């Protein structure tokens, strides 16, 4: 993955 993928994971946790 890339750095963008890390942001996606954060969004999921946030949700």
UniProtKB/Swiss-Prot annotation:
It comes from the Bacteria. Not known, part of the enterotoxin complex. This is 48 kDa protein. It comes from Bacillus cereus.
